[in-house]
A protein has these predicted regions:
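Amphipathic alpha-helical
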Residues: 1-19, 92-105, 109-114, 305-317
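Short beta-strand-to-turn element immediately C-terminal to the catalytic PLP-Schiff-base lysine
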Residues: 65-67, 293
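Alpha-helix/helix-capping structural signal
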Residues: 2, 56, 70, 87-88, ...
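Residue patterns forming the tRNA-binding/recognition surfaces of aminoacyl-tRNA synthetases
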Residues: 1-59, 113-118, 127-130, 139, ...
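Protease-associated
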Residues: 63, 70-148, 157
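Molybdopterin (Moco) oxidoreductase catalytic core of the xanthine/aldehyde oxidoreductase family
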Residues: 75-90, 178-181, 186-190, 310
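Short, structured patches in soluble enzyme cores that scaffold and shape functional sites
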Residues: 28-30, 52, 68, 76-79
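Short amphipathic beta-strand/extended segments with alternating polar/hydrophobic composition
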Residues: 37-53, 81-91, 107, 300-310
Length: 317
């Protein structure tokens, strides 16, 4: 497996391909507040209905996200109580044949009331401190889905950034090849079992509804296989601390042909560039000359070696 940057993927017009995948509406059981019955429905189970297009990430769930500025509704559907963004009720509450589902509107409340509440782990395994809570995030909208977003920090950029901000556990359930390393689908490639996961969880009552969608999905521009987002330990160059120096160097000392690139595309790239990932773990790449060690006092040291001669000298031979 090979890590790829967004730029590498988007440079190839054919990297994004239209495919059909199962999306699922998942039932996360809301816990009552400590010391009192559920404030939304007396002594009845209440489920937060979250939508995801990646059923294979559900085993790594550690949080849910809502928008505190949206209004949410609790409804009763076939004897079950669901919480969904009010503006999305008509879109969500249809069956798999796209027919409206009858429901009773029980309550409406601001999203702010959900923030900080806890829910039961989806597949039974508690992922540790600060896991399985509801957080407010602006990226949650009423454009699509249910107004409630399943968060698996190891497998999505927004998810990971949210986890870093709130100190939410980042749980890996897949290796770098996309094969499960734990749980019921141990040893299976995610693309081989994605549909099976959706169907199995629906049979168990964890998934309320499966909706197949056609969407544009990134593929490797070399081999044509599907790509996955996966958090991976990496070395980064701190671009933010060097940005002004880089802009000055480009302006004062570099001549560009054609000239318009200098203060155009390249300068704009520097102005907007995020930290640069230096380590890609590619089997054909050169090793990074970074050495780490611990001295006799237990203090860690990092040394960047600039040449073979320097490395030879440091080796003490």
């Amino acid at each position: 497996s090979t890590p790829l940057s967004k730029a590498e993927v988007t440079m190839d017009a054919g990297a994004y391909k239209d495919i059909t995948d199962p999306s699922v509406f998942v039932k996360f059981e809301l816990k009552p507040k400590q010391g009192e019955d559920n404030i939304y429905s007396d002594k009845e189970k209440v489920y937060l209905l979250a939508w995801t297009t990646t059923p294979w990430t559900l085993a790594a769930n550690t949080a849910l996200a809502i928008n505190k500025n949206l209004v949410y509704a609790e409804v009763k559907v076939n004897g079950e109580n669901f919480i969904v963004a009010r503006d999305l009720l008509e879109k969500v509450l249809v069956d798999e044949k796209h027919q409206p589902v009858k429901y009773d509107l029980l309550k409406q409340f601001d999203g702010e009331e959900l923030v900080g509440r806890e829910y039961k782990p989806l597949l039974g395994e508690n992922r540790g401190k600060n896991a399985h809570k509801i957080w407010a995030e602006d990226f949650v909208s009423s454009e699509d889905g249910s107004g409630i977003v399943h968060i698996a920090p190891a497998y999505g950029e927004d998810d990971f950034n949210m986890a870093q901000k709130h100190h939410i556990p980042v749980v890996h359930v897949l290796d770098e090849k996309g094969v499960y390393t734990e749980g019921e689908w141990l040893g299976s490639l995610i693309w081989d079992v994605n549909k099976d996961i959706a169907k199995t969880l629906k049979e168990r009552g964890i998934v309320w509804k499966i909706k197949y969608i056609k969407h544009s999905y990134p593929h490797c521009h070399r081999c044509g296989t599907k790509l996955m987002y996966r958090a991976h330990p990496s070395w980064f160059m701190d671009i933010a601390s060097m940005r002004l120096d880089m802009l000055k160097e480009n302006s004062d000392n570099i001549n560009w042909f054609p000239e318009h690139i200098k203060h155009g595309r390249f300068e704009k790239n520097i102005e907007m560039a995020p930290d640069w990932n230096l380590s890609r773990d590619r089997f054909w790449a050169s090793p990074m000359p970074v050495w780490k060690g611990v001295d006799k006092d237990g203090k860690e040291h990092i040394k960047v070696v600039g040449s073979f001669d320097e490395l030879y000298e440091l080796s003490g031979k």
